[in-house]
Amino acid sequence: MSSYMEAAAAARAAEAKTEGLLRGACALLAAAAALLVGLNTQTETVLFIRKKATVKDVQALWVLAMAAAAAAGYHLLQLLRCFYLSRFADGKPCRHRRAIAWLCFLLDKGCAYITFATTVAAAQACVVALYGTHALQWTKLCNIYTRFCEQVAGSLVCAMLAAVGTALLSVVSARNLFRLYPSMLSPPPSSFVG
């Protein structure tokens, strides 16, 4: 019986370590996306006028920067929670385990949806900047602000990877949540056990 408990404890520790690594990667990717797009500026001369491209020129990019920064902060807090639970609260029962698991599950889902939605909205705005919209007489901007567009593309890649990682973390949260509920299935009859 003790070998089973030791194996279960080792499995929980490995799962916590994997979740921590994934949360750390998501935090780094989201922070990189926020910094790449948030600190990005480029000044060019267009028809004898100096124009400066910033993240605030495109509302979707500004929202992406704020959402990615919030996601990075959230993942950092969850990483600290994972660290605390794996180091200091190992084996101690918690009265509010289900409530905490539900909260983590819902926050992970919300973070995944928001990160994905803002990344896709920013990508759509970037497609307009890349190709222009002739019906609205919007010209291409990426041939003028090349470095700005390249950095935005890099931030979109980081943000999309963070969104995929956050979706994986929501699966982990769902597993951790529903593990707390007992199975409703009855055990198989003894004739099937063999």
UniProtKB/Swiss-Prot annotation:
InterPro entries noted in UniProt: CASP/CASPL (IPR006459), CASP_dom (IPR006702)
Main subcellular localisation: membrane
Extracellular topological segments: 40-59, 131-151
Transmembrane spans: 19-39, 60-80, 110-130, 152-172
Coiled coil: none
Topology within the bilayer: Multi-pass membrane protein
Cytoplasmic side: 1-18, 81-109, 173-194
Keywords, sorted A to Z: Cell membrane, Membrane, Transmembrane, Transmembrane helix
Protein's name according to its UniProt entry: CASP-like protein 2C1
